[in-house]
Regions:
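Alpha/beta-hydrolase fold active-site neighborhood
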Residues: 385-508
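Conserved acidic catalytic loop of the alpha/beta-hydrolase fold
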Residues: 293-306
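N-terminal export and membrane-targeting signals
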Residues: 22-51, 309
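Alpha/beta-hydrolase fold nucleophile elbow
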Residues: 305-314
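Catalytic-loop region of hydrolases
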Residues: 29-32, 43-47, 59-261, 384-387
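Active-site loop->helix "elbow" adjoining a glycine-rich segment at hydrolase catalytic centers
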Residues: 314-319, 327
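A catalytic-pocket lid/entrance helix-loop region that shapes and gates access to the active site
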Residues: 208, 234-248, 324-386, 433-442
Length: 508
């Protein structure tokens, strides 16, 4: 595909190619990153992974994938700024006669003769040239052959001679004796565990829809700094965890109802707890996306890959975009599912979410109007207004929940509605059932139970390990968002924005 390229900056427009199921180009268009791409479906993920092989055959590298709905089963693929990977970078070679890995499993994949050849950033030589030793994981999943390793990285890349932290990796080795490289995974969040993701997806890679990837690549999940088995943040005491497990306290949420003053005060208390309980409290100032991307480049070098191959979901697409901006010469095949627009501010991104959810809600209402049991009558506008008014009253009079469940206030009820409305039209009857009981009997039991059946949530997170993982994801989300998007504006502008959101997106 000579002559087709995207600008080197992620903040400019990109050339998007629309492929059909057979990876044939059926259209192309230029997209400005100020227009938020829509999300992909889970089915699309499996199809898009074929692009790793298909685009390799074409001599091109995939650097972003979204899936704006088009006619038929089509997908949008962005080519990176090299029009032909094999002609612009030294090629990777494989063979059984040479190996960069030692007998103890350090370095690259067994049987690989990959060589990084990439430039090592000044001052980071010791990190890029450390030994990487893979060992059998102590918590291996039955039927897999996971290997684990730990990488040391600077706490602060601007001062690499200072404190260091560790990043944990978990690898599902390729079924090939001469793999072409590695594919790194990020589940999103921010705050998601890549190690948990690879545990959950092992079956797909071993014998399911992703087996073609494992036939060519090692697949590696890693816990970003501050998460899981990497140097973690800890913003809670052991007693806090026990209280949540026992049901005496409620796990925190990324959405906190209350006034701005209440939220700021809560944040101050939580920040103090993070400083108190975190082993390396300075990590809270270095959980930004750019630092995670720089960690990824260290990992890329240590597995002996010249280019980074990466698969990111949701926030992971933003991480992938930041990596391509920081290391444009080290970009391999990067698949981004449910893409975030990297040019948007935090406020613009959240507003885009609300707009999408609200539009999906309107589509749901239109599909249910006139059906037996649907509790929202009138036009679509009237139905939305009635639902918003109903939700607004729940803070003063929450929905009851049977069997000892906690009452549903506005925040919890709207989150349950959102879960059911955005999941799939196939689940919309579950939402209608829950709304009917909530609005006719002021009982939120069915609404909550139906939402939990899709999200996997409900009540206590379960074990201590699950509780800690939840706590880390919530606090890591806050730390990362605050570092990536510092607050701008003032109380007056925030009040004006809130009034605008309530007018334009009355439900969500």
């Amino acid at each position: 595909m000579p002559g087709l390229a995207t600008p080197t900056s992620i903040n400019q427009s990109s050339v998007w190619f629309i492929f059909d199921e057979d990876m044939r180009i059926v259209a192309m268009r230029r997209l400005r990153t100020s227009s938020p791409p829509q999300t992909t479906s889970r089915l699309t993920v499996l199809t898009l992974l074929g692009a790793l092989t298909a685009c390799s055959m074409l001599g091109a590298s995939v650097t972003a994938v979204a899936s704006p709905p088009t006619q038929g089963a089509q997908h949008a693929v962005v080519l990176d700024n090299s029009t032909n990977a094999s002609s612009t970078r030294p090629s990777q070679t494989t063979g059984s006669n040479s190996s960069n890995g030692s007998s103890n499993g350090s370095g690259g994949s067994k049987g690989s003769s990959r060589s990084t050849g990439a430039k090592v950033p000044k001052g980071l030589e010791s990190f890029y040239r450390q030994d990487l030793t893979w060992t059998d994981c102590p918590d291996g999943v039955t039927g897999t052959a996971f290997q684990c390793a730990t990488v040391t990285v600077p706490l602060d890349y601007d001062h690499p001679q200072g404190k260091t932290i560790t990043v944990a990796l978990k690898k599902l080795p390729s079924t090939s004796s001469s793999p072409r490289g590695s594919v790194f995974l990020n589940p999103g969040g921010p705050g998601g565990s890549g190690i948990s993701l690879i545990n959950a997806q092992a079956g797909l890679y071993k014998s399911g829809g992703l087996s073609g990837v494992l036939a060519n690549y090692d697949v590696i999940g890693f816990d970003p700094r501050g998460i899981g088995q990497s140097t973690p943040i800890t913003c809670w005491s052991p007693d806090d965890v026990q209280a949540i497990v026992a049901g005496r306290a409620e796990a925190p949420s990324q959405l906190t109802p209350g006034s701005a003053t209440d939220i700021v005060a809560k944040g101050s208390r939580e920040a103090a707890a993070c400083q108190k309980y975190t082993e390396v409290p300075e990590i809270l100032d270095h959980m930004d996306t750019r630092s995670v991307a720089r960690d990824m480049d260290v990992m890329r070098a240590l597995v002996k890959d010249q280019d980074l191959n990466f698969f990111g979901y949701s926030y992971g697409t933003y991480l992938g975009a930041v990596y391509t901006e920081l290391f444009p010469d080290n970009v391999g095949r990067v698949v981004l599912d449910s893409a975030m627009d990297p040019a948007l501010s935090r406020q613009e991104a959240f507003e885009g979410d609300a707009a999408a959810w609200e539009q999906t809600l309107r589509t749901y209402i239109e599909s249910q109007q006139g059906k037996a049991g649907f509790p929202l009558s009138g036009t679509t506008d009237e139905a939305v207004s009635r639902l918003a008014t109903f939700l607004d009253g729940l803070d003063a009079h929450p929905l009851t929940v049977s069997d000892g469940g906690k009452p549903l206030d506005r925040t919890k009820a709207s989150m349950a509605i959102r879960t059911l409305v955005v999941a799939s039209p196939d689940n919309w009857p579950l939402l209608t059932e829950g709304l009917a009981q909530a609005m006719n009997a002021h009982d939120g039991t069915t609404l909550m139970r139906n939402a939990e059946s899709l999200s996997g949530g409900g009540g206590s997170p379960g074990t201590e390990e699950q509780t800690v993982e939840l706590l880390q994801s919530v606090y890591a989300f806050s730390a990362n968002r605050c570092l990536d998007f510092p607050d701008t504006g003032n109380q007056a502008s925030w009040d004006a924005a809130l009034a605008s959101y309530r007018r334009d997106y009355p439900v969500f």
